[in-house]
Swiss-Prot record:
ATP binds at residues 393-400. Its main location: cytoplasm. The lineage of its organism: Bacteria, Pseudomonadati, Chlamydiota, Chlamydiia, Chlamydiales. The gene is lon. This is Lon protease. It comes from Chlamydia pneumoniae (Chlamydophila pneumoniae). It is found in: Cytoplasm.
Length: 819
């Protein structure tokens, strides 16, 4: 429908007197030309924007107040009730400003049947479309009046047109089945037409379609009956295909919706029927029954039972659809799922425990001894109270697996979580229930998962715990790990005291330096040192190779590691303190072997092959060795001394190099990423040697006019600690005397300004590093004699140890020829 929206148009003047004058002139001219003619030769033209109309149609259009409305009112009162309807060339053109150049030449003549005014000054105009017209020439642009010619269809019905008509009628019938809305338009058409006129049938069928305005205008302009009905049939079939597709889509959607609605209604009816018959309870009753059933299997303390009963009473008053109901139900779910009073039954069998520990781990005698002590205490005291053990050692030495083994030998449930990088105390103590998505902390979650009040809880990477504005998790752990407090542990979410005193806590860390002292004070520290070559070799043979072979699907008959291959792998590819890299290299070799076996099996005539991994062919699987030697010098030069260090990754050798260059004054310079403590050690060593030189080297002057440069190789690696004190003095003395230190000597110890040698830590790790670097003469502080004596015999084999309490003792070992 088209309408006029602007009554102030400069082109059309809405003056009714002018319109009547022009209308009179038009009637006179029309009567002069032909008194018998029913349709006028001159018509006012009304532009159409959307779609053209076709003869034989009844068309209602909406006209807003303005020039066209005035023209239509005058025409309706006159004897000439006809107006021309012509489509604009461009869609959505401003019809008040349209000229004849912007209109198509072909349109229709319409008779005004009725004008029905409506609110707002507009009107609904009912038109009867009579004939096709063609604009011959405009008469006056101001009112878009034109001289027109008419086209009457040839009513001769040929066989071909009859066939076309039958096809169109058939398609219309199919359309009526798919879209019942077409029935009303069909009845209007049949009121003043019939299907025996092909032209009218074509026009009607095209009007039913949703074709584009250009396609419809093309049919309107086609006067040849055969061409017109052919185009009409094409558009009608397109409409049929579109209607079928639309109907198919609607059926699918309706089927889905109907099915869902049907299922919903049936379920609701079934639920209602079951409730009426007492066969099914409502959601609230089901929840309460579930909570009550849990409580019957638990020994809930009175203070907790009181809270649970209050919450159940509150739940009974809430609507199941409310948010508060969900919060209350979740809270009760957590309160009732905690295993109140339930404990795992322990087995205190020392022999069986020892077998399990030896089966799972090689070495680690101190750790195994502590576990056996734990079991013995539990057996004598008729129950094992909670303990807090912290396993400290480099990565890959088996800290986490030891925790699993402890749970296994005690027959307790095991729960592990890592606090590395944790910055929110709510992870430990839970969130307040006022927060959306609130939940208890890890401790309560551990109890829920283990369903016992005495599980083994492993807290990994406790040395890497963080802190933020959300709180300090390390401080939250203080309550958890304090035996005097954790029996009344209070989780923020539960807000009910929970007894953690029967939980065995096992913590792991690489270093102790970053653990807060109050937290460290609550733990029993057990150190796991790195492994030496012999230990790694046994671990690889007994544990790593069989396990990796099983994982990859190989057997011992298909691949075999020779001992020298494993030794070569340990020395040249996996020198870390643990065995993680070694395990990765073993799997890498086995994967390559698996590939070769499968490739061989796919050959037409394949034979079974056994792969023997030796030190000679190991490089074909792992590539070039990563490490060459831990020793920088096979023969120690002047000014160099070998120290022993201890890091979070295990023990290591530390070389101290000293050289002197000419300078105006005597001075010392230290490089090699040394920390503050090590810088102080170098100053102490420098000062001590200066003060004691007259005793060690009478007649020598202390580096006259020289600058001494002390360097610690591997400058990219930060180093710190006091244990290199005697090594620095030895390096400086070697430089001053121009005498090399005895070969294969390693040392560690802190020195004071008076020459006293103090004890240091990490004796086992340093001993392992010395063995790895083939140092067989070692100097340890006298204060560390006890630490050395506690080490297993296989670590001491082949080593000559000197214990010293003063640097005078170091001098005798490092420079045996010096008197």
């Amino acid at each position: 429908m088209d309408s006029t929206t602007n009554s102030d148009s400069p082109i059309l003047d809405p003056n009714p007197e002018d319109v009547e004058k022009l209308l009179d002139e038009s009637e006179e001219e029309s009567e002069d030309q032909s008194t018998e003619r029913l349709l006028p030769s001159e018509l006012f033209i009304l532009p159409l924007n959307k779609r053209p109309f076709f003869p034989g149609m009844a068309a209602p259009i909406l006209i807003e107040s303005g020039p066209y409305y005035e023209v239509l009112k005058v025409l309706a009162k006159s004897s000439q009730k006809y107006i021309g309807l012509v489509l604009t060339k461009k869609e959505n053109a401003d019809i008040l400003k349209v000229s004849f150049n912007q209109l198509h030449k072909t349109g229709v003549a319409a008779r005004i049947l009725r004008i029905m005014p409506i609110e707002g000054g507009s009107a609904q105009v009912l038109l009867s479309i009579e004939e096709r017209i063609r604009i011959i020439e405009p008469i006056k642009d101001k009112y878009l009046k034109a001289r027109v010619s008419y086209h009457a269809d040839n009513k001769e019905l040929t066989e071909e047109l009859k066939a076309y008509s039958i096809s169109i009628v058939s398609v219309i019938k199919d359309l009526l089945k798919l879209n019942p809305l077409f029935k009303e338009e069909l009845q209007i058409f049949l009121g003043h037409s019939d299907f025996t006129e092909p032209g009218k049938l074509a026009d009607f069928s095209v009007a039913l379609t949703t074709a584009t305005r250009e396609e419809l205008q093309e049919v309107l302009e086609t006067t040849n009956m055969h061409d017109r009905i052919d185009k009409a049939l094409i558009l009608l079939k397109k409409e049929l295909d579109l209607s079928r597709l639309q109907s198919s889509i609607n059926q699918k959607i309706e089927a889905t919706i109907t099915k869902s609605q049907k299922e919903f209604f049936l379920k609701e009816q079934l639920k209602t029927i079951k409730k009426e018959l007492g066969l099914e309870k409502e959601d609230r009753a089901i929840d309460i029954e579930k909570f009550s059933e849990r409580l019957r299997k638990r020994h809930v303390p009175d203070y907790a039972m009181e809270v649970i009963q209050d919450e159940i009473e509150k739940l009974q008053t809430l609507e199941t659809s409310s948010a508060e109901y969900t919060v209350c139900r979740n809270y009760l779910d957590w309160l009732t799922i905690i295993p109140w009073g339930i404990q795992s039954k322990e087995y205190h069998d020392l022999k069986k425990a020892e077998i399990v520990l030896n089966k799972d781990h090689y070495g680690l005698d101190e750790i195994k001894q502590r576990i056996l002590e734990l079991i013995s205490v539990g057996k004598l005291s008729k129950g094992l109270k909670g303990s807090i053990i912290c396993l400290v050692g480099p990565p890959g030495v088996g800290k986490t697996s030891i925790g699993r083994s402890i749970a296994k030998v005690l027959h307790r449930k095991f729960f592990r979580f890592s606090v590395g990088g944790m910055r929110d105390e709510a992870e430990i103590k839970g969130h307040r229930r006022t927060y959306i998505g609130a939940m208890p902390g890890k401790m309560v979650q551990a109890l829920k998962q283990s369903q016992a009040m005495n599980p083994v809880i492993m807290i990994d990477e406790v040395d890497k715990i963080g802190a933020s504005y959300h709180g300090d998790p390390a401080s939250a752990l203080l309550e958890v790990l304090d035996p005097e407090q954790n029996k009344d542990f209070l989780d923020h979410y539960l807000d009910v005291r929970v007894d953690l005193s029967n939980v065995l806590f096992i913590l792991t860390a690489n270093v102790l330096d970053t653990i807060p002292d109050p937290l460290l004070d609550r733990m029993e520290i057990l150190r796991l040192s790195g492994y030496i070559l012999e230990e790694k070799l046994q671990i690889a043979k007994k544990y790593l190779v069989p396990k990796a072979r099983k994982e990859i699907g190989l057997t011992a008959s298909e691949v075999n590691f020779q001992p020298e291959a494993l030794k070569y792998m340990i020395n040249n590819y996996a020198r870390e303190a643990g065995v993680r890299t070694l395990n990765g290299n073993i799997k890498k070799v086995l994967r390559k072997v698996a590939l070769k076996i499968v490739q061989n099996q796919e050959k037409p005539k394949s034979k079974k092959i056994t792969f023997k991994i030796s030190s000679k062919n190991l490089q074909t699987y792992l590539g070039k060795p990563i490490f060459s030697s831990d020793r920088f010098y096979e023969s120690t030069p002047v000014g160099v001394a070998t120290g022993l260090a201890w890091t979070s990754l295990g023990g290591a050798t530390l070389y101290i190099e000293s050289v002197q260059v000419s300078s105006l004054k005597t001075d010392m310079h230290l490089t090699g990423q040394a920390g503050e403590v090590m810088k102080e050690s170098s100053q102490i060593a420098w000062t001590y040697l200066h003060s004691a030189l007259h005793r060690y080297a009478p007649g020598y002057t202390f580096f006259p006019k020289s600058q001494v440069h002390i360097h610690i190789p591997e400058g990219a690696t930060p180093k710190d600690g006091p244990s290199a004190g005697i090594t620095m003095v030895t390096s400086l003395l070697s430089l001053l005397l121009e005498t090399p230190v005895v070969n294969n000597l390693g040392m560690t110890g802190e020195i004071t300004l008076t020459g006293r040698v103090l004890g240091v830590g990490g004796i086992r790790e340093k001993l392992i590093a010395a063995r790895r670097s083939r140092l067989n003469i070692l100097i340890f502080p006298e204060d560390n004699r006890r630490d050395y004596e506690e080490l297993p015999a296989y670590l001491k084999t082949g080593l000559k140890i000197h214990f010293v309490s003063h640097y005078d003792d170091v001098l005798k070992v490092a420079f045996p020829k010096l008197k």
